[in-house]
């Protein structure tokens, strides 16, 4: 399967890329390095023993998204490219709205125009607050 991973050089994104590559999937990945480093790309290749397609791209840039989808046959998107720092989100909410909402809409619009109908969206454990016990179960109430 050809899988696009957004936020690919972040902690969860990079580990997901390694797992997907080890399982034999073709990975197309992008990140804007807002909260990660470029050298993670080489670490993913070293750990998985495989190469993959990478774009230095921002999901809020419609042209970046169009380029990625035009140059690749994508079957599914795994979406990790969201800002997640709760304290910062309260201090600069418009930046979070722009990236997390507008950026996701840009991604979804390009997916629609290229007939890509499968997406896995990763949220954050911060939606649960401070649970009294771990692990958190599926029916745990949100904060």
Where are these regions (language model features)?
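N-terminal Rossmann-like NAD(P)+-binding domain of SDR-like oxidoreductases, especially those catalyzing
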Residues: 1-143
């Amino acid at each position: 399967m050809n899988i696009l991973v957004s936020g690919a050089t972040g902690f969860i994104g990079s580990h997901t890329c390694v797992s997907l590559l080890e399982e034999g999937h073709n990975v197309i990945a992008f990140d804007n390095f807002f909260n990660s480093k470029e050298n993670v790309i080489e670490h993913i290749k070293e750990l998985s023993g495989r190469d993959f397609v990478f774009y230095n791209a921002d999901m809020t840039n419609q042209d970046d998204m169009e380029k990625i989808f035009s140059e690749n046959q994508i079957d599914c998107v795994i979406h990790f490219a969201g800002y997640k720092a709760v304290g910062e989100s309260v201090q600069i909410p418009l930046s979070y709205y722009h990236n997390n909402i507008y950026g996701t809409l840009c991604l979804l619009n390009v997916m629609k125009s290229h007939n890509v109908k499968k997406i896995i969206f990763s949220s954050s454990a911060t939606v649960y607050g401070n649970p009294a016990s771990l692990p958190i179960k599926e029916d745990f109430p949100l904060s």
